[in-house]
Curated annotation (Swiss-Prot):
Annotated positions binding 3-phosphoshikimate: 21-22, 26, 164, 166, 312, 339
Catalytic reactions on record: 3-phosphoshikimate + phosphoenolpyruvate = 5-O-(1-carboxyvinyl)-3-phosphoshikimate + phosphate
GO molecular function: 3-phosphoshikimate 1-carboxyvinyltransferase activity
Lineage start: Bacteria, Bacillati, Bacillota, Clostridia, Thermoanaerobacterales
Name of protein: 3-phosphoshikimate 1-carboxyvinyltransferase
Superkingdom of the source species: Bacteria
Amino acid sequence: MDVEVKKKNSLKGVISVPGDKSISHRAVMIGSIAEGLTEVENFLVAKDTLSTVECMRKLGVDIKLERNRVKVYGKGLYLSKSSEVLDVGNSGTTIRLLMGILAGQEFETILTGDDSIKRRPMGRVIVPLTLMGAKIEAREGNFAPVKIRGGKLRGIEYKMPIASAQVKSSIMLASLYAEGRTVIEEPALSRNHTELMLQTFGARIEIDGKKIFCYPGSKLKGQKIIVPGDISSAAYFIVAANLLPNSEVVIKDVNVNPTRTGIIDVLKGMGGNVELINERYVNNEKIADIVVKSSKLKGIEIGGDLIPKLIDEIPVIAVAAVFAEGTTVIKNAEELKVKESNRIKSMTSELGKMGAKIFETEDGMIIEGTGFLRGAEVESYNDHRVAMSLWIAGLLAEGRTIIKKAECVDVSYPDFYKTFDML
């Protein structure tokens, strides 16, 4: 499906964005290995999270889904062998976190996914899980499909070579089945939803800076989880409202966990008008309403420990940088190369077609703020974050923009285009 987007004069209104994707995945997975009923409200109903639901069902978990409410009837730590290959679709979170759970199961499972998943690196998960005692085979180069036989695991001390919430989470989930303590050390803080949710369910997880101490032996108990709005989905509205004149948008009930708010930190650093109100905590997660108004942005340098806090938002930050005064440099973001597409290449190529002065580097991009884009026919590369970022570019461009394969937004935000029509 192709979509057409035309220049918009301003954005005004109050909206909600769908439930957080990371938290929705984790609520279903951890609820499945807990004892008793877990009820999840405001669950994100999208292709990625439904892949998690289907995989857990194939492992014997009874899950009832009604609109955005989910009931998970947990089986405890030990699941049932699937008679089928588990297909995670496009979901990197599903395959990597599920490998952690399957490392503790005394049966063999094969995991696969779509073409995008088969290009994404699995070695970063295979290495620590193998050290813990799981037996894992993968396609040459450590790519999916992956065959995993779990069993008796041992605790390890593991220094992660890259900051990755998915890798960290996989090890933490495996640690529930291990004999002895597991210690994980990150090079920089990545999103910490797994730590917070495991603590909510009753696991003994201790955090000391960039170190996480995981102790086995706790029984997980079913919980009621209220999923806050996803800041990664809110990011598109935050950027658009900053850039379009005479705009004011309020986004209700958004997750503002400090490991996820890099987009707000960066926009404020660029001079953006973003304010958090009505701050509170639900299920250990910080939530707020976000108020965004039009502003004039200036270019900055983005890198270092900030990158894991905004890795998914860099494509839309690139759009903001086109309309900022001066030059924006994004560095230390090599991880973008192994997302659903190579997002460095995708964004430099497609914004370039629209007239942006944007240049690819080894670990990021350099954007000169020209304040101008022209409409063009652009490719999404079947990458939801690229498609949504190009939609924002189209709202700001002169003339019309056509986005190819725009239905890929269904992975994380099926009503994305409709929500913009409300403003």
